[in-house]
């Protein structure tokens, strides 16, 4: 027996049944959808609950979502001090390589938690005023890209 001569066992594979192709095909007329009605059509929209007040209208709402809000990955000076040697160049690519910043889609912001005496050259999407002040006080440089 060769590989191309292999066959499935009898009844192991069912043939696909094409519905709505006439009586002779076996699944004609109503095509397994029952009698004419709303659910025989292409379907209702997502979230439709048959006329009952849908979930997204029953649940109370609070506040609002600011369209212009930017979510940052925050990184502290303390973290950079522990992870990098003196005079290191720090940018988003390096932070992703070292797995300090996990999400490549979010911008990175430097915060002033902790302190450092190392002279870093930092290029990030955002930094707090205090963080910039601390890095420059240590002799480093911060550039917002």
From Swiss-Prot:
Q: What is this protein called?
A: Large ribosomal subunit protein uL15
List, alphabetically, the InterPro entries matched.
Answer: Ribosomal_uL15, Ribosomal_uL15/eL18, Ribosomal_uL15/eL18_sf, Ribosomal_uL15_bac-type
What are the GO BP annotations of this UniProt entry? Answer: translation
Which residues lie in Basic residues bias regions? 14-26
Query: Subunit composition?
Result: Part of the 50S ribosomal subunit.
- What top-level branch of life does the organism fall under? Bacteria
Name the keywords, alphabetized.
Ribonucleoprotein, Ribosomal protein, RNA-binding, rRNA-binding
Question: In the record, what terms sit under GO molecular function?
Answer: rRNA binding; structural constituent of ribosome
Record carries keyword Oxidoreductase: no
Described function: Binds to the 23S rRNA.
> Locations of Basic and acidic residues compositional bias?
1-13
What are the record's GO terms for cellular component? cytosolic large ribosomal subunit
Q: Could you tell me which NCBIfam families the record lists for this protein?
A: rplO_bact
Indicate yes or no for the key word Nucleotide-binding: no
Describe the family membership recorded for this protein in Swiss-Prot or TrEMBL.
Belongs to the universal ribosomal protein uL15 family.
Region named Disordered? 1-56
């Amino acid at each position: 027996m060769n590989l191309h001569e292999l066959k499935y066992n009898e009844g192991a594979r069912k043939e696909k049944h094409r519905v709505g192709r006439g009586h002779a095909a076996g699944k004609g007329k109503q095509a397994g959808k029952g009698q004419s009605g709303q659910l025989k059509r292409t379907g209702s929209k997502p979230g439709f609950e048959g006329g009952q007040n849908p979930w997204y209208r029953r649940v109370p709402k609070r506040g609002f979502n600011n369209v212009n809000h930017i979510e940052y990955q925050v990184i502290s000076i303390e973290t950079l001090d522990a992870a990098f040697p003196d005079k290191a160049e720090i940018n988003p690519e390096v932070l992703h390589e070292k797995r300090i910043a996990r999400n490549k889609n979010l911008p990175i912001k430097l915060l002033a938690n902790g302190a450092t005496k190392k002279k870093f050259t930092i290029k990030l999407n955002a930094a707090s005023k205090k963080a910039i002040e601390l890095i420059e006080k240590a002799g480093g440089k911060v550039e917002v890209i």
